[in-house]
A protein has these predicted regions:
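Register-specific detector for alpha-helical tandem repeat solenoids, activating on a conserved position
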Residues: 95-96, 121-122, 147-148, 173-174
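Residue-level detector of functional hotspots within protein domains
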Residues: 69, 119, 145
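N-terminal capping/linker segments that flank leucine-rich repeat
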Residues: 2-116, 183-186
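Structural signature of tandem-repeat unit edges
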Residues: 81-89, 103-116, 128-144, 154-170, ...
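A sequence-composition feature that detects small, non-aromatic residues
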Residues: 70-71, 99, 121, 133, ...
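Intrinsically disordered, low-complexity segments
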Residues: 28, 149, 153-156
Length: 186
């Protein structure tokens, strides 16, 4: 019997891509692990259903608005392999946001507004299948904590950190711990 895990995101304009299908989810729909429920404000709330009868999407693209709860750790299901987020909201912490997603291979945060983010600690920790993280164009001028941000990302091949202003960064302990294949471009 499946269990429901509530994910505390309000999302607008979300698209779920499947291996062979692309769905644009309507206000009330249930398909492949994902139930979107309309809240009357034009925003949806995301629920992950662990029912084994329905396969999980392998890619999520979020455009326009995503509003996480204050602690946004462990928010994505383990079977997703690609995440792309375009964000324009005032969020100060991404602590453990993508940590322990063992199947994720690609994350694109290039359109993410991170100008107010202060904490990126453990953000991708234990994403041991992660090969590519597009962090180009993100603003980390307010970030003070990146401890273990990529720790144990053993498949990560390269990161482009050129043009990143790390003047406020005070904690970067073990940021690339056990990233045995990583090449950094600075």
């Amino acid at each position: 019997m499946g269990t429901n895990k509530k994910i505390f995101f309000k999302i607008k304009n979300i698209k779920f891509e499947y291996i062979t299908l692309l769905f644009l989810l309507l206000p009330i729909i249930s398909c492949n692990f994902i139930n979107m429920k309309f809240k009357g404000t034009g925003e949806e709330q995301l629920f992950i259903n662990s029912n084994k009868e329905r396969p999980c999407p392998n890619k999520i693209t979020v455009d326009d608005v995503i509003i996480p709860n204050p602690s946004c750790k462990y928010k994505f299901p383990n079977k997703i392999v690609t995440i792309k987020i375009n964000l324009n909201k005032d969020i100060k912490s991404f602590h453990k946001m993508f940590s322990d997603i063992s199947n994720i291979i690609e994350i694109d945060l290039s359109q993410l507004d991170t100008s107010l983010v202060e904490n990126m600690a453990n953000m991708f920790e234990n994403c041991n299948s992660l090969i590519f993280a597009n962090l180009s164009n993100i603003d980390i001028t307010s970030v003070t904590n990146m401890e273990k941000m990529f720790s144990n990302c053993i498949s990560l091949k390269s990161l482009d950190l050129t043009n990143m202003d790390i003047a406020k960064l005070t904690n970067h302990k073990m940021i690339f711990n056990n990233c045995i294949h990583l090449k950094i471009h600075i």
